């Protein structure tokens, strides 16, 4: 299990939505990422939750802020601790917000065919994108906004599909995160209808790659779900994706992908009203130490969840779900929620 806890857009660092911290803050922090309920997956392809995460089928709500980026800029997504058992593809889509609509109030419906794929990576040379490749990149995945893309407001949908239980449907686990970006630049192209899908609708139980046995022992390729990658209308070939190759995603620089990186420089000017300023500090996945026997130990909720992931990972392919869950729940019962202290350091609020 996991989620994107930090994103670097055009060289600027933004803190992602923190599901175990933000809801308990007052006021609730404003983000460029749409809220997610936690680090768990979506498994039902018919629910609106498959679009940008959520629970109960209602999806998620727009975020308050917008990041600014030029067409051709890179976006680097930093993930929380990702279990090595959760093999699968890493896929990124973008969806253009309709004209005369503000992204901070726009929630696509399941019938809105707006999503086009800008990056994908699956299985190549014995390595899975979500585990082998991403872990070698400090839990970071980097994509490029197509240079040909016309200016406008876009939702960037970044996901991992975990295949460790995908022998049948339902089984595959989907982890989508959505970010709000104002794209600038001289680009003039909008993807044609052949490149667009809806969510739900972009994947079905019979889509190649949705069911897949990763334990067969004879894997040579993997059919990545969804349409082909769009970089321009001229380059787009149409049809269904059958790519099994890892993308040419570049390794993010150490200043963009590290959860312990130094504070980002404040942007000298906002791109537009409601635009997000870069994070004043890079919040790591977990800064609290592991649970200790001492009653004075401060345990961050993210540490509880990361230890839960490791417990599940260690028991694959048949983990002790009840035991790992009980340990997680006991940890969370006494956990605190990591936040920025007034001193600017991570920890409990100091007064």
Curated annotation (Swiss-Prot):
It is an enzyme of class 1 (oxidoreductase). Its main location: membrane. Binds 1 copper ion per subunit. Its cofactor is Cu(2+). Cu(2+) binds at residues 1, 86, 175. One of its GO terms (cellular component) is side of membrane. Gene3D superfamilies: 2.70.50.70. It catalyses: [(1->4)-beta-D-glucosyl]n+m + reduced acceptor + O2 = 4-dehydro-beta-D-glucosyl-[(1->4)-beta-D-glucosyl]n-1 + [(1->4)-beta-D-glucosyl]m + acceptor + H2O. It is a lipid-anchor; GPI-anchor. The keyword Metal-binding applies. Lignocellulose is the most abundant polymeric composite on Earth and is a recalcitrant but promising renewable substrate for industrial biotechnology applications. Together with cellobiose dehydrogenases (CDHs) an enzymatic system capable of oxidative cellulose cleavage is formed, which increases the efficiency of cellulases and put LPMOs at focus of biofuel research. Disulfide bonds join 52-178. A lipid is attached at residue 280 (GPI-anchor amidated serine). GO terms for molecular function: metal ion binding; monooxygenase activity. O2 binds at residues 164, 173. GO terms for biological process: cellulose catabolic process. It is found in: Cell membrane. Its EC number is 1.14.99.56. Glycans are attached at residues 53, 138. Coiled coil: none annotated. Lytic polysaccharide monooxygenase (LPMO) that depolymerizes crystalline and amorphous polysaccharides via the oxidation of scissile alpha- or beta-(1-4)-glycosidic bonds, yielding C1 or C4 oxidation products. Catalysis by LPMOs requires the reduction of the active-site copper from Cu(II) to Cu(I) by a reducing agent and H(2)O(2) or O(2) as a cosubstrate. Belongs to the polysaccharide monooxygenase AA9 family. PANTHER family: ENDOGLUCANASE IV, PUTATIVE (AFU_ORTHOLOGUE AFUA_1G12560)-RELATED. This is AA9 family lytic polysaccharide monooxygenase A. It comes from Gloeophyllum trabeum (Brown rot fungus).
């Amino acid at each position: 299990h996991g989620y994107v806890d930090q994103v670097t857009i055009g060289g600027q660092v933004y803190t992602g939505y923190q599901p175990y911290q933000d809801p308990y803050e007052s006021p609730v922090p404003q983000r460029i990422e749409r809220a997610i309920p936690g680090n768990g997956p979506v498994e039902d392809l018919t629910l609106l939750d498959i679009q940008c995460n959520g629970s109960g089928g209602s999806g998620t709500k727009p975020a308050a802020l917008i990041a600014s980026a030029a067409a051709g800029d890179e976006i680097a997504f930093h993930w929380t601790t990702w279990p090595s058992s959760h093999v699968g593809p890493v896929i990124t889509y973008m969806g253009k917000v309709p004209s005369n609509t503000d992204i901070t109030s726009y929630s696509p419906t399941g019938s809105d065919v707006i999503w086009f794929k800008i990056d994908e990576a699956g299985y190549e040379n014995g390595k899975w994108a979500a585990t082998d490749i991403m872990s070698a990149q400090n839990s970071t995945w980097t994509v490029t906004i197509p240079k040909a893309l016309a200016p406008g407001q876009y939702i960037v949908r970044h996901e991992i599909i975990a295949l460790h239980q995908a022998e049948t449907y339902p089984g595959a686990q989907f982890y989508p995160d959505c970010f709000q970006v104002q794209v600038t630049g001289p680009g003039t192209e909008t993807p044609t209808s052949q490149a667009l899908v809806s969510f739900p609708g972009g994947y079905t139980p019979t889509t190649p790659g949705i069911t897949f046995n990763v334990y067969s022992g004879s894997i040579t390729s993997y059919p990545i779900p969804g349409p082909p990658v769009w970089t321009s209308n001229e380059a787009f070939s149409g049809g269904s994706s059958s790519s099994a190759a890892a993308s040419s995603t570049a390794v993010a620089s150490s200043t963009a992908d590290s959860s312990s990186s130094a504070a980002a420089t404040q942007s000298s000017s906002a791109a537009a009203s409601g635009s997000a300023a870069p994070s004043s500090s890079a919040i790591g996945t977990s800064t609290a130490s592991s649970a200790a026997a001492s009653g004075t130990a401060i345990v961050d909720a993210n540490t509880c969840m990361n230890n839960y992931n490791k417990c599940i990972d260690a028991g694959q392919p048949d983990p002790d779900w009840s035991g790992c869950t009980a340990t997680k729940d006991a940890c969370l019962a006494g956990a605190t929620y990591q936040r920025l202290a007034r001193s600017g350091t991570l920890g409990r609020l100091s007064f």
